[in-house]
Amino acid sequence: MRSGDLELYTMNIDGSDVKQLTSQLGYDGGAFFSPDGSKIVFRSSRPTTEAEIAEYKSFLAEGLVAPTNMELYIINADGTGLRQLTHLGKANWAPFFLPDGKKIIFSSNHAAPRGYQFNLYTINLDGTGLEQVTFDKTFDSFPMFSPDGKKISFSSNRNNGGTRSTNLFVADWVD
């Protein structure tokens, strides 16, 4: 928390040339670079009302965050061109670029009436073309691709015998 808030930074592997990329009040995290290294996708909760700001700062003072409402953002790797990708409400998180760098896959509970049902979705880099990928009644999240783009891995609470255990699933990816 160099700036007093949870921001995104880049730096060289030796710790030199630290650059702050984000500066708006709120929790910025879960960042991943695009395959070509030119863009970064991340999740963020951005408090706007006085009550939200007070709650955020109170939690932050205790080293905590309560990011129940998170949206996805994309920014150029040099810190320019910040754009909000999703406007879905609830929790949109665990973003990851598809291997071709043209879409983002992420987890969201925006369609869940009670909030605990998370599924995977894809979206274009301009925020259009939202498409649901998984249709589970529990929790699917943390999607990532194999280096060749032929497999997707993700965590899920499906097929766990009614426990809260989360397991890793690997599936063929068909675009």
Regions from the language model: what does each represent?
Residues 89-91, 100, 104, 125:
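Active/binding-pocket-proximal capping segment
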Residues 12-16, 76-80, 124-128, 173-175:
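Short loop/turn segments that connect beta-strands within beta-propeller blades
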Residues 35-36, 99-100, 147-148:
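Residue-level detector of Asp-centered blade-edge/turn motifs that repeat once per structural unit
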